[in-house]
Amino acid sequence: MSGFSLSDLERIVEERSKASPEQSWTAKLVAAGQPKAAKKLGEEAIEAVMAAVTGDRNNLTYEAADLLYHLLVVLKIAEIPLENVMAELERRTAQSGLKEKASRQSS
């Protein structure tokens, strides 16, 4: 198992976002703004879904990595730290998924 974490990736996204857009894909996406980054996130999500549906495990692994990376870029642009997302996941997993979903529908 790798010791690499989403927090590590978040730090890399932060560092690379400060580079020149001509030298870094991350900086280029951040400079292009949320519409471009969100579009790329959507494209990667579709590619991951297609890999899952076709049962292509290798491609799904590759696309899942792309999806996580682009999600962190979108969060960076929105100034939402990964810590906030993890706190929300922790809150949700404190109860059953069905109960949590029902509580969202009633609010």
Curated annotation (Swiss-Prot):
Gene3D superfamilies with a match to the protein in the record: MazG-like (1.10.287.1080)
Pfam families given for it? PRA-PH
Record EC number? 3.6.1.31
The family note in this entry says: Belongs to the PRA-PH family.
Bilayer-crossing residues are none
Its subcellular locations are: Cytoplasm
- Pathway, according to UniProt? Amino-acid biosynthesis; L-histidine biosynthesis; L-histidine from 5-phospho-alpha-D-ribose 1-diphosphate: step 2/9
Its recorded name reads: Phosphoribosyl-ATP pyrophosphatase
Chief site of localization = cytoplasm
Q: Which UniProt keywords apply?
A: Amino-acid biosynthesis, ATP-binding, Cytoplasm, Histidine biosynthesis, Hydrolase, Nucleotide-binding
Specify the domain of life of the species encoding this protein. Answer: Bacteria
PANTHER family documented for this protein: HISTIDINE BIOSYNTHESIS BIFUNCTIONAL PROTEIN, HISTIDINE BIOSYNTHESIS BIFUNCTIONAL PROTEIN HISIE
A molecular function annotated in GO for this UniProt entry is: phosphoribosyl-ATP diphosphatase activity
**Which BP terms does GO give this entry?**
L-histidine biosynthetic process
Q: Which reaction does it catalyse?
A: 1-(5-phospho-beta-D-ribosyl)-ATP + H2O = 1-(5-phospho-beta-D-ribosyl)-5'-AMP + diphosphate + H(+)
Gene Ontology cellular component terms for the protein in this record: cytoplasm
